[in-house]
Regions:
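Bacterial N-terminal signal peptides
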Residues: 11-23
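Solvent-exposed loop/turn segments at secondary-structure junctions
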Residues: 45-49, 103-107, 152-157, 197-198, ...
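A well-ordered secondary-structure block
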Residues: 138-140, 144-242, 246, 354-362
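Bacterial N-terminal signal peptides that target proteins for export
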Residues: 1-14
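N-terminal, active-site-proximal structural segment of metallo-dependent hydrolase catalytic domains
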Residues: 28-171, 386
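Metal-dependent phosphoester-hydrolase catalytic domains
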Residues: 197-208, 233, 256, 260-263, ...
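Active-site beta-strand/loop signature of hydrolases that rely on acidic residues for catalysis
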Residues: 40-45, 82, 86-112, 117, ...
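Surface-exposed intrinsically disordered loops and tails
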Residues: 59-77, 110-125, 157-182, 203-222, ...
Length: 386
C-alpha cells in the first residue's frame, strides 16, 4: 500500500462496517417493533339501581316496594346524562373494540304479577334503552361506533310501587294496591367496533352460561340470574386475526363457596371449546367480579385464578383501581376513594403475542354532575405481533 491509498482504503472499510452495523440495527429494530397496535376497552355502564333489596325481599308486598325503589333509583341516576360522559370517555381513548356490560333495557307495562309467576316478561314500552342512548352520543355528527354482537342476559318483569305512595295502584285492593306499573329489566352485554378505523369483524357469537345463580324473591319465587358472553374474531388495520371476548360474571353469589358461581362461569369461558378457548390469540375484557391482589372478601379471587390457571395474563394497569361508587344513591355524590378494588379486566391467553403498550383507567371523576357509572372504565393499547 502506498501512503496515499492506505488511508482511503481504511476509510472505505470503516464506512462499510458502519453501514453493515446500521443495517443490522435497523433490521433488529424493525423486527422488535413488528406488530399492530390494537386499542380495546371494557366499560360497565351500571344498570342504574341496586337490585339487592328486591333479591332479598321476603314477601310479595316487600318485593313490590323494593321494585318501586329500583324504578325511582333508575330515574335518579339519569342515564341520558351519564351517556354523555360515557361517550366522552370512549371517544377520548378511541378504542377499536369495546366490551360493554350492564347495557340495560328498561321497559314498562300495566301492573301484573303474571310475568313473575310465568317467568315470561311481556312489557314492550321502552323507558330507557342504554345502548340506543349511548350510540346516539357516540355517533353524534358522525358514525364512529357500531354494535357487532348484542347478548340478552337477565330479563325479568315485576310490579312496582313506582311513586312510593300507598293505595294508588290501578289494581285496587290486594297485592297490587300500591303498584302503578310493571318494570322490566333486560340486561345486555355488547361489543362495539370502531367505524372507519380498519376494524374488520367476523364470526360473531353469544350465549348464556349454564351455571347460574338462583335467588328466591318475594319469599317464594325462584329466578335464575342469567349471565353470559359475547365474542367476535377481528383484525385491526391489517393485524394478525385475534378472538375478542366480552363477559360479565356473577356478582351476587356467595364468594365463600368453592367453587363459587362466578368461578364456575369463568371455567365455562376457558373450557375446551368454550368462548375463550381459540386457536387465535384471545383478548378477553369484562367485569369478572374477581381479583386476587385487591380481593375484598375471602373467595373473591376464585374466578380470576381460574383464568390465570388457564394461561390468561393481565394486559391492563392495576392502578388506580376502578370499583366502585357504592355510597351514592343517584351517582351525584361519593368519592373515587370508594373505587378501592379491581373487578374489570383486560386479559390475553397469548402473552408472547399480545403485549401491553399503555393502559388507562377512565371515569374516576364526575362529569355533567354525575359519575358516569359506579365503575371506572379500563382501556389498553396492545401490540399484536404478526
Amino acid at each position: 500500500l502506498t501512503a496515499s491509498t492506505a488511508p482511503r482504503r481504511a476509510a472505505v472499510l470503516l464506512l462499510a462496517v458502519a453501514s453493515l452495523f446500521a443495517a443490522f440495527a435497523a433490521g433488529a429494530e424493525a423486527k422488535s417493533a413488528k406488530g399492530t397496535t390494537v386499542k380495546v376497552m371494557s366499560r360497565n355502564l351500571y344498570l342504574g339501581a341496586d337490585l339487592t333489596p328486591a333479591i332479598q325481599s321476603t314477601s310479595t308486598e316487600s318485593f313490590i316496594e323494593a321494585n318501586g325503589g329500583i324504578v325511582r333509583q333508575v330515574e335518579a341516576t339519569n342515564f341520558p346524562v351519564r351517556a354523555k360522559g360515557l361517550a366522552k370517555e370512549i371517544l377520548g381513548e378511541e378504542p377499536d373494540l369495546v366490551g360493554l356490560q350492564e347495557v340495560a333495557l328498561w321497559r314498562e307495562a300495566p301492573p301484573s304479577l303474571g310475568p313473575v309467576f310465568s317467568g315470561r316478561p311481556e312489557a314492550t314500552k321502552v323507558k330507557y334503552d342504554f345502548l340506543k342512548l349511548l350510540l346516539a352520543q357516540l355517533n353524534k355528527g358522525k358514525a364512529l361506533y357500531r354494535p357487532v354482537v348484542v347478548q340478552d342476559e337477565f330479563d325479568f318483569e315485576a310490579p312496582a310501587n313506582a311513586n312510593g305512595l300507598p293505595g294508588d295502584g290501578p289494581g285496587g285492593t290486594g297485592l297490587l294496591a300500591n303498584a302503578e306499573v310493571n318494570g322490566r329489566l333486560t340486561m345486555r352485554d355488547v361489543i362495539l367496533a370502531r367505524i372507519g378505523a380498519g376494524v374488520v369483524t367476523s364470526n360473531p357469537k353469544n350465549a348464556n352460561f349454564s351455571k347460574l345463580l338462583v335467588v328466591k324473591v318475594a319469599g317464594a319465587k325462584e329466578i335464575s340470574v342469567t349471565r353470559g358472553w359475547t365474542s367476535v374474531d377481528a383484525t385491526v388495520r391489517g393485524s394478525k386475526k385475534f378472538h375478542f371476548v366480552n363477559t360479565h360474571l356473577e356478582a351476587f353469589d356467595n364468594e365463600a363457596e368453592y367453587p363459587s358461581v362466578r368461578a364456575q362461569q369463568a371455567g365455562e369461558l376457558v373450557a375446551p371449546g368454550g368462548p375463550a378457548a381459540s386457536k387465535l390469540p384471545v383478548i378477553l375484557v369484562g367485569d369478572l367480579n374477581s381479583d386476587v391482589k385487591t380481593e375484598v372478601k375471602p373467595g373473591d379471587g376464585q374466578a380470576y385464578r381460574v383464568m390465570t390457571k388457564a394461561g390468561f395474563r393481565e394486559r391492563a394497569t392495576g392502578k388506580p383501581t376502578g370499583c366502585c361508587i357504592d355510597s351514592s344513591y343517584d351517582l351525584k355524590t361519593g368519592s373515587n376513594k370508594e373505587m378501592n378494588h379491581k373487578v374489570d379486566h383486560i386479559m390475553t391467553d397469548d402473552p408472547k403475542q399480545v403485549k401491553l403498550l399503555e393502559s388507562a383507567v377512565t371515569g374516576r371523576a364526575k362529569s355533567n354532575g354525575y359519575w358516569d357509572s359506579d365503575h371506572a372504565g379500563l382501556f389498553s393499547a396492545l401490540n399484536i405481533l404478526r
